[in-house]
Amino acid sequence: MIISAASDYRAAAQRILPPFLFHYMDGGAYSEYTLRRNVEDLSEVALRQRILKNMSDLSLETTLFNEKLSMPVALAPVGLCGMYARRGEVQAAKAADAHGIPFTLSTVSVCPIEEVAPAIKRPMWFQLYVLRDRGFMRNALERAKAAGCSTLVFTVDMPTPGARYRDAHSGMSGPNAAMRRYLQAVTHPQWAWDVGLNGRPHDLGNISAYLGKPTGLEDYIGWLGNNFDPSISWKDLEWIRDFWDGPMVIKGILDPEDARDAVRFGADGIVVSNHGGRQLDGVLSSARALPAIADAVKGDIAILADSGIRNGLDVVRMIALGADTVLLGRAFLYALATAGQAGVANLLNLIEKEMKVAMTLTGAKSINEITQDSLVQGLGKELPAALAPMAKGNAA
């Protein structure tokens, strides 16, 4: 299959992966309305073309948390990467490291912190949930510190798991799930050989290290699901802020008031995110939520954004809407599943090239020059009637 654009990786991944894995990464919550709007809303943001601007000295470089980035992109924390490619977290981290951008290791990675961190030169970021088992949280933070992780990404939009109906149909969950997954695996030989046989162990590496025993998909659904904490409040984050002396980013912000709370709390950054449409269906897309949040806290805190970003044009759009940096999730996972480290490396090259074209034709020589002036119009005039009341409720 010819890969000429980032979108080609999705089709390739669907062919290679057993359905339970493809649909787990591809799907969203409930009817997947927000999942669709994330992509569609962002694609509708019109860039303002400018000409004859002498763009010969264009630069994508930026700085975030005193780290130099080759472009305003980081790889998002995505669980179970090691089920999509052989030791997938290591391969993705190496690709990000080679490109000069951060890699974020998920709490529920297959490869543990101690396997990924030594494989790269750049300090990686680490993502953590608020869980009932505070002992696990402290253990994970201590290990992340010891491994030299530079930034903590704290995910707060999962006090309870979202309902992902696709998983029951695909075999990730539901009746006879284990047998269905086995039958799917044996009918996808490329994945079965590369990951199923040669990618072992398929533990939840960070959790296994804490529990002192092997773990697997059932623990992902069981132990982790039972440990999400619906009683979470800002107060529960205070001990973590005291313990972690590096940059701390709050992931899962969709409302300007929550963004202001993050500033008051003392966070170093926020991620405008709806968890890729995987938590609460019907909330605003990140693209629609971002401008009001940027109006509220731009300059007071670093603003990152994810959900719906599929190519370099989308990166430029998110920056113009108010983000300082974006996180890639599904986009890099499709590439990882298709061709491992080489696939992610090629994806990042494609995104960089697309960004350069977009910046050249909008007259932005640097990331700081990508502003609302780079857009034809704001999102407000484009809101469907059904979303207008929601947008009003989210206005600063």
Curated annotation (Swiss-Prot):
It is a peripheral membrane protein. Its cofactor is FMN. Catalyzes the conversion of L-lactate to pyruvate. Is coupled to the respiratory chain. Its EC number is 1.1.-.-. FMN binds at residues 106, 127, 155, 251, 306-330. Substrate binds at residues 24, 129, 164, 278. Pfam families: FMN_dh. It is found in: Cell inner membrane. Keywords: Cell inner membrane, Cell membrane, Flavoprotein, FMN, Membrane, Oxidoreductase. One of its GO terms (cellular component) is plasma membrane. Belongs to the FMN-dependent alpha-hydroxy acid dehydrogenase family. GO terms for molecular function: FMN binding; L-lactate dehydrogenase activity. GO terms for biological process: aerobic respiration; lactate metabolic process. Its main location: membrane. The keyword Membrane applies. Gene3D superfamilies: Aldolase class I (3.20.20.70). Residues 1-380 form the FMN hydroxy acid dehydrogenase domain. It catalyses: (S)-lactate + A = pyruvate + AH2. This is L-lactate dehydrogenase. InterPro entries: Aldolase_TIM, Alpha-hydoxy_acid_DH_FMN, FMN-dep_DH, FMN_HAD, FMN_hydac_DH_AS, LldD. The active site is at residue 275.
